[in-house]
Curated annotation (Swiss-Prot):
Domain Helicase C-terminal: 393-548
Gene Ontology terms: cellular component: primosome complex
Phylogenetic placement of the source organism: Bacteria, Pseudomonadati, Pseudomonadota, Alphaproteobacteria, Rickettsiales
Chain positions recorded as Zn(2+) 2 binding sites: C367, C370, C385, C388
Source organism of the structure: Rickettsia conorii (strain ATCC VR-613 / Malish 7)
Cofactors, names only: Zn(2+)
GO BP field: DNA recombination; DNA replication initiation; DNA replication, synthesis of primer; double-strand break repair
Residues holding Zn(2+) 1: C358, C361, C398, C401
Protein name: Replication restart protein PriA
Keywords assigned by UniProt, alphabetized: ATP-binding, DNA replication, DNA-binding, Helicase, Hydrolase, Isomerase, Metal-binding, Nucleotide-binding, Primosome, Zinc
Length: 648
């Protein structure tokens, strides 16, 4: 009897046994169509065996035509992810095969490489970087100041790999970043790269998967899920803005796409290049211990000057009511506009105001399903929870004490900054970019096009605007609240604040005119600002690493979070306490249980247990044993987060 264990792209499923028809020859990695419940699915031949313990075995229908199969390297990646992130194989297979590709033949357009393309001249510093990269045999970080030409360096590497007939993957934390890179890519290489993200249609994704499996697709630019594409001939993986938290998936399988891509590069024997002006602490540590190599660019392309950074002490400002721009920043904006230069105002807070409260009883309007405040959105006349999406009308009276005309709004969001900017500069063309105002890559591309063509004078944006955009006529950046996020009770709060301020400041002065960045702060003596102002990231990283080491926290240790959630807070807390009580205490440090920073999310109360262990300790083996000691009731949802990035 010939049996094939078939891995189906179905969540929480392990390989299932199927009979192999007599006339069918199969190899591990082949794609086959099998009956599953009341439908047919495409699955991966995971293992070939001679017997089965299953009482009833169905038969494989057919092998997928066109010699489409999954390489042994991708199969190894699936196994590694299942083991490391403690997830079922079927859930990971769903990332590799997100939809059925065994339907009728799809015409796949082959990417034709134009061999006559001419890459621009590199500076001497960039040439040295390319030489080092060509000789490197380990993951390499290209660390350069904002505007130093990191993209041009990996474009030269792409050219080399295309000449060898290899496939290339360029990963971006947000596909919104892709617009400018795609345009530059087409200029350089004469063909359009494939884009892979959540907005690509199902039909187009099928075509892309067929193209990758048949080696007709050579270059893909994609978000985190692109690392699972079934490349057959992968030669280069570029991870741009490698420090970005968007590489960590916080729902479904909790994985870090940057780290997983590096593992994939090992399996595929592909070169790994990481790029960032503000690399993650983990990457800096990996360089220090010799695991990664470093290439540094200290000059901006064409030796353009870095912007000056000024700290504005907001405790000395006498702001009028509903005003959030300091006099110094307003005067700087006026001067910039008079000189026909563009302005970026940055506030990492969506909506009009983050809080509405009652002046009579002090009640704060919170989400009925979460422990978060409801955000005021004036444009839509709604209150919205930015965590679960719940919306309600804007109340005219307090829902708690029922008093009329006692509700007031507190603090600014970008809609409020837009309102103030329009009042101050009525003749200027002002635009806003955030998840609310640019909900699609097409809308983002439109705004970027307007900015590049000087159709916008003042751009007001959230974190989305900090990621690698190049506007040569932008010479002034104003950070409305530089304190936001720096005082969070979070291991990475200082790191994130430094990276964010450095990145947003790097948008200024990338053309012929020198830029200036104003940071508005009520805590101007914050040491982070001194590092940002001096551009001294090396000292910042050294200090941050010393703090982490003394606290025995990553990257000097391993961590995992066990997250318990359910509709009864008392029952969830009881289970969490029982888990900690029975947990083996040798070789690990256990913190908690503690309420998550977001203690209630989508109607579920949430508690966390944090496990800290030595770098060489097998944390996954420990967690499996620990979880085997207790039965978790069905009303309690348990998630394991290996290498957690946040504790919300």
């Amino acid at each position: 009897m010939r049996i094939a264990k078939i891995l189906l792209p179905v969540a929480k499923l392990f390989p299932l046994d199927y009979l192999i028809p007599e006339d069918l020859e199969l190899n591990i990695g082949d794609l086959v169509v099998v009956p599953f419940r009341n439908k047919e699915l495409t699955g991966i031949v995971w293992e070939l065996v001679s017997n089965s313990e299953a009482k009833k075995i169905k038969t494989i229908r057919v092998k997928v035509p066109l010699n489409l199969n999954i390489t042994s390297e991708v199969l190894e990646l699936i196994k590694w992810m299942s083991s490391y992130y403690m997830s079922e194989l079927g859930s990971i297979a769903k990332l590799v095969l997100p939809m059925d590709i065994a339907e009728k033949p799809i015409k796949v357009k082959e990417q034709k490489v134009n061999n006559n393309f001419v890459l621009p001249d590199l500076s001497e510093e960039q040439k040295q970087a390319v030489t080092i990269l060509n000789e490197s045999n380990k993951p390499t970080l290209v660390k350069g100041v904002t505007g130093s030409g990191k993209t041009e360096i990996y474009f030269h590497l792409i050219a080399d790999y295309l000449a060898k007939g290899k496939q290339v993957l360029v990963m971006l934390p947000e596909i919104a970043l892709s617009t400018q890179i795609i345009n530059r890519f087409i200029e350089r290489f004469g063909f359009e790269p494939i884009i892979w993200n959540s907005s690509v249609t199902k039909a187009h994704k099928k075509m892309i998967l067929r193209g990758i499996l048949s080696d007709k697709v050579k270059v893909v630019i994609g978000a985190r899920s692109s690392l699972f594409l079934p490349f057959k001939n992968l030669g280069l993986i570029v991870i741009d803005e490698e420090h970005d938290d968007s590489y960590k998936q916080d729902d479904g399988i909790l994985y870090n796409a940057r780290d997983t891509a590096i593992v994939r590069g090992t399996f595929d024997k592909a070169q790994i290049v990481l790029c960032s002006a503000t690399p993650s602490i983990e990457t800096i540590h990996n360089i220090e211990i010799g695991k990664y190599q470093l290439v540094t660019l200290v000059n901006r392309y064409k030796n353009v000057d870095l912007p000056n950074i000024e700290i504005i002490d907001m405790t000395k400002e006498k702001l009028s009511k509903n005003s959030y721009l300091s006099k110094l920043l307003i005067e700087a904006i006026k001067g910039n506009l008079d000189n026909k230069k563009q302005v970026l105002l940055f506030l990492n807070r969506r909506g009009y105001a983050p809080l509405m409260l009652c002046k009579a009883c002090g009640y704060r309007l919170t989400c009925k399903f979460c422990s978060s405040w409801m955000v005021v959105h004036k444009a839509t006349k709604k209150l919205e929870c930015h965590h679960c999406g719940y919306q309600s009308k804007i109340f005219s009276s307090c829902p708690e004490c029922l008093e009329d005309e006692t509700l007031t709004i507190c603090g600014p969001g970008i809609e409020r900054i837009e309102e103030e900017a329009k009042a101050l500069f009525p003749e200027s063309k002002i635009a806003v970019i955030s998840k609310d105002h640019a909900k699609s890559p097409e809308k983002i591309a439109q705004l970027l096009h307007q900015m590049e063509n000087l159709e916008i004078d003042i751009l007001i944006g959230t974190q989305i605007i900090t990621k690698g955009y190049h506007f040569p006529n932008l010479t002034l950046v104003g950070v409305i609240d530089a304190d936001l996020g720096s005082n969070n009770a979070d291991l990475r709060a200082s790191e994130r604040t430094f990276q964010l301020l450095h990145q947003v400041g790097g948008r200024a002065g990338r053309g012929d005119s020198k830029g200036v960045v104003y940071l508005q702060s009520y805590y101007p003596d914050n040491t982070i600002f001194s590092y940002v102002k001096a551009g001294d990231e090396d000292s910042f990283f050294a200090n941050e690493l010393e703090i982490r080491k003394s606290a025995d926290m990553p990257p000097f240790s391993k961590t995992a979070s066990v997250i318990l959630s359910g509709s009864s807070e008392a029952k969830i807390l009881e289970i969490a306490r029982d888990m900690v009580r029975i947990a083996p205490k040798a070789n690990v440090k256990i913190l908690g249980p503690a309420s998550s920073l977001m203690s209630k999310l989508a109607g579920k109360y949430r508690y966390r247990i944090l496990i800290i262990a030595n770098k060489k300790f097998n944390l996954q083996k420990y967690l499996k044993f620990w979880l085997s000691l207790i039965k978790i009731p069905s009303f309690c949802h348990l998630k394991i987060d290996i290498d957690p990035k946040s504790f919300y």
